[in-house]
Each structure stands twice: as C-alpha cells, then as structure tokens.
C-alpha cells in the first residue's frame, strides 16, 4: 500500500516535474490537433487521464498472469477496450465535442504516454500506485494541453471556454484575432516555448553535449 507521500509524488511529479510532454516529449501529436479550443482540450484531457489510469489499474491487476512474450499485445487489448468505452461515452453524452475530436479519441491507443506507463510502471507495480501514476500522467498531459489551448483560444478567437474575453472588431470591439493561432502549427511553437521554459528553469533536463 502506497503511503501518503508516495501517493502525492505519483500524482504531482508528472505535472510539475517529469511532465510527459514538456520533458519526455510524448503525446505531442494530439496536443497539436485538439488545442484550438479549451472545450476539446479539456475533454481530451479527461479521456486520456481515464484511459491511462484504468489501463494501468487493469494491467497491474493481471500483470502476473500475462506471459512476457505477449505482454505488449495484452496491454494494447486493454487500452483499446478502454478507448472504445470512452469513445462511446463521448458519443452518447457529448456528441458535438466527440465530432470535433474526430479520430483523435480513437488514436489514444497509439499515445506513447498510455503505452509507456503501462509498460514501464503498471507491469512492475501494485494496482493503487499504478492507478495514481496513470492519473498523474494524464493530468501532466492535460496541464500542457490546457495551457496551449488557453493561449490559442484567447489570442485566436478572443474567447475562453466559449466566453468572450477580448471584444472582437467584427462585433464592434477592439481586438483583431490572430488566425494563425487557430492552425495546428501554432501549437507546435507554443509547446516548443513551454519545453524551452521548463528546461531553462531546470538545467538538469538539458541533454549533455557530445
């Protein structure tokens, strides 16, 4: 059983320290595609967190019964099943957002964060720590997604969660939206700035020169 300090570490380290996007540079593709609006970024965060947490939990529960030779296949089967469940829940209760997310919910199965935590942590750890590790990494992923989405939606549309913050010129206001920030390449540059900022703050994360 994990003690409180270990549980806190499992939840907070991926968010504040070893962030899966900012430091490990994993899961970047979906971060580029679903961050033009806060709503889609938030729902994607919930989806990835749920899949990562529960896949870690279930894989940890059956880890001693999985033959080593087929462990990757078993992990993918668990993850794929959870992705299908999440996709169906979104279609049932948040159909409009599900349409906006399009194929990217289904592509959670290919997200390196989900597979990486299953292989590196859940296969070697007890169920509760594995579950918390999944939540922590999902929240770390979401922290970057929501940061990028905040910048893109406010500067690109003048809104945040659909609420107008910057009055647009078209509506008699003063702000001229930057359409470039609504395009996926803008997310690439914002994530690059986040990675640069994190590694500047923590020089230990900078790769050693050859």
Curated annotation (Swiss-Prot):
GO MF annotations in UniProt: oxidoreductase activity, acting on NAD(P)H, quinone or similar compound as acceptor
Gene Ontology CC annotation, any one: plasma membrane
Class of enzymatic activity (EC top level): translocase
Spans through the membrane: 42-62, 72-92, 103-123, 131-151, 178-198
The protein's Enzyme Commission number: 7.2.1.1
Membrane topology: Multi-pass membrane protein
Keyword Ion transport attributed: yes
Function: NQR complex catalyzes the reduction of ubiquinone-1 to ubiquinol by two successive reactions, coupled with the transport of Na(+) ions from the cytoplasm to the periplasm. NqrA to NqrE are probably involved in the second step, the conversion of ubisemiquinone to ubiquinol.
Subunit structure: Composed of six subunits; NqrA, NqrB, NqrC, NqrD, NqrE and NqrF.
Protein name: Na(+)-translocating NADH-quinone reductase subunit D
Organism: Aeromonas hydrophila subsp. hydrophila (strain ATCC 7966 / DSM 30187 / BCRC 13018 / CCUG 14551 / JCM 1027 / KCTC 2358 / NCIMB 9240 / NCTC 8049)
Lineage: Bacteria, Pseudomonadati, Pseudomonadota, Gammaproteobacteria, Aeromonadales
